[in-house]
Amino acid sequence: MPELPEVETVRRGLTPVLAGARLSRVRINRPDLRFPFPERFVERLEGATVERVDRRAKYLLLPLSTGETWITHLGMTGRFTLDGTQLGEFEEAAPIAGKHEHFSGCAIRDGAATRIGYADARRFGFMGLIPTDQVETHPWFAGLGPEPLGNGFSGAHLVEAFAGKKQNIKVSLLDQRIVAGLGNIYVCEALYRARISPLVAAGSVSKARLETLASVVRDVLNDAIAAGGSTLKDFANAEGGQGYFQHRFDVYGREGEPCRGESAKAGGCTGTVARVVQGGRSTFYCPSCQRK
């Protein structure tokens, strides 16, 4: 599933073409994705101008000139493509299957038209239209915690959120009410960089270590965004290219492999990456340098 860096990469790819563009020739090729498309979806988008392209957690939000905001969640396999437009600097191309394209349209800006496509092979993504002044109170967003790249996220926030919490820190960090948009991959990587065991109770971690963790979370996410996200099975950025952060994983997906020498030099770690299941998700970590 695309996580925050992947969604942010898509947002940055869509912005130069969609922000300020008028939508035209909107089409949907089936009545639903994960949920049915909104009533009169095509009519409500047709002719509207996109004011900007925002992101909240793993959602894309496009406020429109009509007073509504177009919401998209990529689910597990959703992806946008922009034909004829060079976006970002990505390493590989990932062809998109036409039979899975469920939404299309044109973005007209400065006299130029760019075709927009949205494909979702497994159809776990969805689109919605919400009155812009009701977005913050909508059930999709009302319970979300602070953005990990925003000013509201800090070690102090984690200290308060984790106070007395007996649940392990890995699962706690995946709680979208505590921090919005963090997913399994980047929580594993952040805990490794902070040298915190995913097995410890969240409430037992010291303030100093939580300050370090908050800083490391930002670093991991920014590194992933700079690399264009991670390509695991289905993620592709807005032009169909693949992210490359997966080649930098210290622990994720590396069960049985040695703890990376360069990453672990300071602690002299010679451990092996292990995998456990927590909250139904695979957790990868180094038991030697991420001790309880």
Predicted segments with their positions:
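Basic, nucleic-acid-binding surfaces and adjacent catalytic neighborhoods in DNA/RNA-processing proteins
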Residues: 22-41, 157-292
